[in-house]
């Protein structure tokens, strides 16, 4: 599915017909943005003609758009630059299948045009597109401004994901400190997988953005270099934040193990107290279980002897409980 936005005769035009887009582009437009959402990783015939015949993009670049690899890429050609960058668009089950939330955005950028190609529906591109329709003089005042808006949204997706992870980790920490359960460890490991997957893709993204910070590239005007350096700095900051989260998840595992150890110690302490209390009871019951006549039998009789034995047991239990409480053993 294709959609395009550009200026024609002083007014903004949106178009979804590839042939009409090609016709208007050949009339030397000042700036055009074409967005192609691939269905089943395939280009339609009209889209193929647009990319190969109208823009004359290299077939290897087009092939890279059809088969995402989750590695950034910048390739410089005679009349354009091809790139592939990656961001995160969280899905409902992202904690179990985080890789499905990672998208690849391919782009062709040259003098007066930007072509974006992706295999998944990217909502942030729709937002930028609608803003460009509503405020074309602001959002599409230059190629650099349009490209910056796209890059900024991609990099910001990492920050949004980190906020989600922080909320999850804070909740886990509270649960662990209150009452650690086996399910908490499963959640920690799922979070760890998400963080390490983010780190894997984020570390390599800087190599793509650094190209647009160089003063000797032919695409970005000097006054806009500072914007793309901001993108590069933001990406570097995200990398450091992700590295910090990897350290935090290790600390969270240590907190869980410590909490489990404390909980186990409390259980063992309780069981030890029970066993210690029962021990004198067993001794007394074993003593009175012997088939002999005890001296107190002649004083208390059969019933009295039973109460005498039970009394010794109760007094022993109470005395031990008072002693344990005084020692703060439970």
Model-predicted regions and their roles:
Residues 1-215, 219-221, 227-230, 234-237, ...:
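Peripheral, non-transmembrane regulatory/ligand-interaction domains of membrane transport proteins
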Residues 233-330:
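Hydrophobic alpha-helical transmembrane segments and their immediately adjacent juxtamembrane loops
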């Amino acid at each position: 599915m294709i959609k395009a936005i550009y200026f024609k005769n002083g007014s903004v035009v949106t178009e979804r017909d590839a042939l009409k887009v090609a016709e208007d582009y050949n009339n030397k437009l000042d700036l055009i943005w074409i967005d192609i959402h691939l269905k089943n990783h395939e280009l339609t015939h009209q889209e193929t003609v647009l990319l190969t015949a109208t823009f004359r993009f290299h077939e290897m670049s087009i092939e890279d758009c059809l088969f995402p690899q989750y590695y950034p890429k910048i390739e410089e050609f005679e009349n354009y630059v091809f790139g592939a960058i990656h961001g995160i668009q969280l899905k409902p089950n992202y904690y179990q299948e985080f890789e499905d939330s990672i998208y690849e955005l391919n782009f062709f950028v040259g003098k007066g045009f930007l072509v974006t190609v992706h295999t998944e529906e990217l909502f942030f591109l729709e937002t930028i597109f609608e803003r460009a329709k509503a405020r074309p003089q602001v959002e599409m005042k230059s190629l650099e401004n349009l490209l910056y808006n796209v890059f900024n949204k991609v990099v910001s997706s990492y920050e949004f994901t980190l906020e989600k992870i922080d909320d999850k980790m804070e909740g886990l920490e509270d649960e662990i400190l209150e009452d650690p359960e086996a399910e908490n460890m499963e959640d920690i490991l799922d979070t760890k997988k998400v963080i390490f997957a983010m780190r894997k893709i984020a570390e390599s993204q800087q190599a793509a953005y650094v190209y647009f910070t160089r003063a000797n590239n032919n695409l970005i005007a000097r006054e806009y270099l500072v914007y793309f350096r901001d993108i590069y700095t933001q990406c570097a900051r995200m990398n450091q934040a992700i590295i910090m989260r990897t350290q935090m998840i290790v600390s969270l595992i240590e907190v869980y193990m410590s909490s489990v150890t404390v909980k186990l110690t409390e259980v063992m302490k309780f069981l030890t107290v029970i066993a210690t209390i029962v021990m004198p009871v067993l001794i007394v019951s074993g003593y009175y279980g012997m088939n002999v006549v005890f001296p107190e039998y002649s004083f208390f009789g059969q019933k009295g002897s039973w109460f005498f034995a039970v009394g010794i047991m109760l007094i022993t239990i109470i005395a031990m409980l008072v002693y344990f409480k005084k020692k703060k053993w439970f």
